[in-house]
Amino acid sequence: RADLVVADGGAHGAAGGPGTIVGMEFSGEIVECGNNVKNVSIGDRVMCSGSSTWAEYAIADYGRVIKIPDNNMDYLTASTLPVALATMHNAIVTIGEFVKGQTILIQGASSGVGLMGLQIAKQLGAKTIIGTSTKTKKFDKLKSLGADVVLNSKDPGWVDQVLATTNKEGVDLIIDLLSGYTVNQNMQATKIKGKIVNVGRLAGGITDFNCDLHA
């Protein structure tokens, strides 16, 4: 999505504008390293995120470099992973402080980043994984990638379905890629002392906020 915006001459964060080389993700072999680079070295096969990556050579901050697993993963596959993988690992593990056995809900789970979140939650041993999408034709895909329950976030009863799934407690953690109309409902669907990690604005960046629900 961001690459299409930049290709059309728009901006994404600090990148963009007419003449900008497109690309946020890439993979390849390291040919040079700075003096203070840690954990990777010349010759390593890596996947990275950055800007202007659709080029023969690209520069990456070593903190955004991930070694490609020592298996048969090819560069094409690896180049599709860095942004989604880093974004969702940060949201679920670093900020969300997810613990094995907890319940998790991913709003906007049918997006590329959301699909990665389902897989991370599955690998980390979530007790129950709930994913949302407004497109019912994508429900089977979400289930195939780890969702135990799939809901439509525009269904007025989705919060009740979450509560029914979690013994009326709500989930331990919500990763919200939507914002907008989901903000107040998210608070209703979260367990007391649970966490909501806001990642995206696919449903809008401005909305009414119910302070009573937050209290």
Residue ranges and their predicted role:
Residues 78-156, 187:
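Mid-domain Rossmann-like dinucleotide-binding core that forms the NAD(H)/NADP(H) cofactor-binding site
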Residues 3-52:
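Glycine-rich beta-strand-centered segment in the early N-terminal region that forms part
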